[in-house]
């Protein structure tokens, strides 16, 4: 489904990703945790070329790309395999919730407007916001805007959804609603890679958890393996510092 081999990314002299290898199976949910500056978000952005890796191989679905040399067509095909959910929502302020969802369906996938609207309304219902179809982002809470961002990603039916700290910009009382939407999507066997600082959420929802630090994958395993029985000392220190994951409400 997703295979990443020897991905490296540096910003001038600062190495952010150093030889990252990763495999994600179809229908699997992978949570990436770690301290700030560990390269988590950069890894996600490299997967859909929002950041161009300096080297390495990326394979998502039927799209393959060599980071050192690729064509515009190869880049376009790789980007089509994923949809991104950003921490700051990235909605079009001048478009309604429904229009934000249907934009990519009409412009990128060339679907008829009636079909795009039907898909958009189905997805809005899935995230519990069908009553907000004609509302603009300015009239919605941060949690509602993020759910629209998730709906937009779902609508294009990607091979995988990449979520970059989807709750980090939300007020605490809005976090649970967004996490519950993501959990419901995970239960439908949607392939997802989630960068998160919500440890309880990662433990409950993920099939695999990856701990990153200093541009490396330090340890990975099932939630039980990584949170309850970490092997690496760096992982143990991190888990101790952030606290044991509580149960997701």
From Swiss-Prot:
GO cellular component: plasma membrane
Superkingdom, taxonomy of origin: Bacteria
Pfam families per the UniProt record, alphabetical: ABC_tran
Domain ABC transporter: 2-239
Induction: More strongly expressed in the presence of methionine than in the presence of sulfate.
Record's keyword terms, sorted: Amino-acid transport, ATP-binding, Cell membrane, Membrane, Nucleotide-binding, Translocase, Transport
Subcellular location: Cell membrane
Bilayer topology: Peripheral membrane protein
Family of this protein: Belongs to the ABC transporter superfamily.
Name recorded for this polypeptide: Probable amino-acid import ATP-binding protein YxeO
Originating species: Bacillus subtilis (strain 168)
Gene: yxeO
